[in-house]
Design a protein with these regions (language model features):
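Hydrophobic alpha-helical segments
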Residues: 1-177
Length: 177
């Protein structure tokens, strides 16, 4: 049971209603996470803009979904794991591959493996990474720009992880183990 108010689309007003309308057009529904974040419409707008900015970054959709899965696993966010297993499959990953990404162990692609290992280390050390972590990330083919974009992507998914953990958001995506 959610701890915070989950604003139903039919009950949304003002900026929240406008944002929900845009989300529904893009996704076909307004997920429970966004219905919760809608309690603070400016924050919802910022979160959506952050994701739109990341979509225009030099990181691919597959890379962004790998980040989302690895970080959500490290954070223990069942809601985001369910949502991003689905969107990870839409980005071309198999169920088995999404499980590997969650474990930050993706042996079939050194580039993606370097990415998920970097973000897991970033989250588990709270950003206090040894120099060799950054060097390994660069050696996996990532630029300084992508270091910054990756940290931005981590911050975006950590926000939704924390909202959903605090709220105990009801999962409205296919559940995963």
């Amino acid at each position: 049971m959610s701890r915070l108010t989950t604003i139903q689309s039919d009950n949304a007003t003002g900026q929240t209603a406008e944002l929900f309308s845009a989300i529904k057009r893009a996704m076909g529904k307004v997920p429970n996470a966004y219905q919760t974040i809608g309690n603070a419409p400016d924050v919802l707008a910022q979160a959506l803009q952050h994701n739109a900015t990341l979509a225009k970054s030099s990181l691919s959709k597959r890379e962004l979904e790998a980040i989302n899965l690895a970080v959500s696993e490290a954070s223990g966010c069942d809601y985001c794991l369910a949502a991003h297993t689905l969107t990870g499959k839409m980005a071309g990953y198999s169920v088995e591959q999404t499980e590997q990404l969650r474990r930050a162990d993706y042996p079939e692609d050194a580039h993606i493996d370097g990415l998920v290992k970097f973000v897991k280390a970033l989250v588990t050390t709270r950003g206090t990474l040894p120099e060799e972590s950054v060097t390994r990330f660069r050696d996996a083919g990532f630029s300084d720009r992508q270091v910054v974009e990756t940290i931005s992507a981590v911050s975006a998914i950590l926000f939704t992880n924390m909202i959903n953990r605090v709220n105990d958001t009801v999962v409205d995506f296919p559940k995963v183990n």
